[in-house]
């Protein structure tokens, strides 16, 4: 179903708006506070999957990953299904949940998580054949180096190469890369805060 033209399609832009707001919901904050009586940041950690694992255990971490993954996947799925993959809307729907996770309105745009799981959700929908093997390679390196960011550092560039090799439609490539760049911007901000690269 195409919704790329006309005033009747204006409501479709609610997809990225809502995606940004939902992106700002950080379940790791609530689960860690429930289990530990303090937020991840108060414990010196991040409110994502890895930080939740360290502070609240694997079950809580799995729940956090599932939620963060879904809030990335669902908006691009909706934009694709309801607007026929219209480029600008797909791009906005890809960036919005990751940006919402990274700089939540609920926190006054102060840094939230790093958006990795949400960007994975975006890219799994847009280019599954490219992302899955790239993600597996990233996970291997992350396990070897014992640092979660290596999933994205290795996985996202490799996914881009595979998208080009597999001739993924340009609108999907642009949207996926935009989500990856949004993760990268937050990671650069994180490195400045921590004064270390990884």
Q: Model-predicted segments: where are they?
A:
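Helix-coil boundary and interhelical linker segments in multi-pass alpha-helical membrane proteins
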Residues: 1-15, 74-92, 124-130, 164-175
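C-terminal ends of transmembrane helices
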Residues: 28-33, 98-111, 138-145, 184-194
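Interfacial segments of multi-pass membrane proteins
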Residues: 53-56, 79-80, 115-146, 158-167
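Nucleotide and nucleotide-moiety/phosphate-recognizing core
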Residues: 60-63, 70-107, 138
């Amino acid at each position: 179903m195409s919704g790329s033209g006309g005033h009747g399609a204006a409501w479709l832009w609610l997809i990225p708006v809502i995606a940004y707001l939902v992106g700002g919901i950080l379940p790791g904050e609530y689960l860690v506070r429930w289990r530990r009586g303090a937020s991840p940041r108060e414990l010196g950690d991040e409110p994502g999957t890895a930080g939740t694992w360290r502070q609240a255990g694997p079950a809580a971490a799995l729940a956090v990953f599932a939620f963060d993954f879904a809030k990335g996947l669902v908006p691009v799925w909706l934009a694709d299904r309801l607007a026929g993959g219209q480029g600008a809307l797909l791009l906005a729907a890809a960036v919005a949940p990751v940006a919402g996770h990274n700089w939540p309105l609920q926190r006054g745009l102060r840094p939230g998580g790093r958006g990795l799981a949400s960007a994975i959700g975006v890219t799994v929908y847009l280019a599954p054949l490219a992302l899955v093997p790239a993600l597996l390679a990233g996970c291997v390196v992350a396990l070897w180096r014992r640092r979660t960011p290596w999933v994205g550092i290795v996985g996202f560039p490799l996914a881009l190469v595979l998208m080009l090799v597999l001739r993924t439609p340009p609108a999907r490539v642009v949207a996926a890369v935009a989500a990856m760049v949004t993760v990268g911007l937050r990671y650069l901000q994180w490195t400045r805060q921590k004064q270390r690269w990884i």
